[in-house]
Amino acid sequence: MFCYDSPEYVKDMGTPDRYVAVCRDYREGKVSGKNLKNKQKAIFLDRDGTLNKYVGFLRNIEQFELIPGIEEAICKINESGYLAIVVTNQPVIARGEVSLEELEEIHNKMETLLGLKGAYVDAIYYCPHHPHKGYEGERPEYKIECKCRKPKPGMLLKAAEDFNIDLSQSWMVGDGENDILAGIAAGCQTALVGSNEHFGETSNFVSLEEFVNKML
């Protein structure tokens, strides 16, 4: 069995109510708008401190806990026509503290928790690298200078290529300077959440929930 995972418009319309909803979406242009032949808009989301509670280096799946209100915020992004795409630095891979399989389990938990409230992310991009070498237990193949680790824009640029995204019509939302710098480098609008810092024209919000309520 094969599965084609797509952010395009796919809905079961096997009941009268669902059929009516699909017809409405078709009339409103939502079906054609989600076709990847057309330019897409995205909200790029940092993970730690933006979606889940910040605990420093998250090494254990039991440490993963969504910030209250995140499910509702992601639902609003899903309904808005924007793609919801996670872009996260995960140096715990390079440090040898979390395996790729364990990271996948953490992200599976995140998607399951979101799904319980009807929310979803369209894609997850992560950078496993870290430039500093010489630590016990590290994985040398990931101890490199890369193009994907924020504040570099590599993950956003890759997503833009994969999903035909217009970066100038998209947002980078995160809780730290590296998120904002990556968004600026990619040509996105930027929003800082949960921080008292200020970066030029970057908009500040208490949380992702406040961002979507005010900007979408």
Predicted regions and their residues:
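Active-site flanking residues adjacent to catalytic metal/cofactor-binding acidic residues
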Residues: 45-47, 88, 174-175
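Generic beta-sheet signal
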Residues: 4, 87, 127, 173, ...
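Conserved alpha/beta core of the MobA/IspD/sugar-nucleotide pyrophosphorylase nucleotidyltransferase superfamily
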Residues: 1-38
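Metal-dependent phosphoesterase signature
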Residues: 52-68, 93-101, 116-117, 139-147
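Active-site neighborhood of HAD-like aspartate-dependent phosphohydrolases
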Residues: 39-84
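Substrate-recognition element of Asp-dependent hydrolases with the DxDx(T/V) motif
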Residues: 70, 74-110, 120-133, 183
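Asp-based, Mg2+/Mn2+-dependent phosphohydrolase catalytic module
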Residues: 101-122, 132-134, 139-172, 176-216
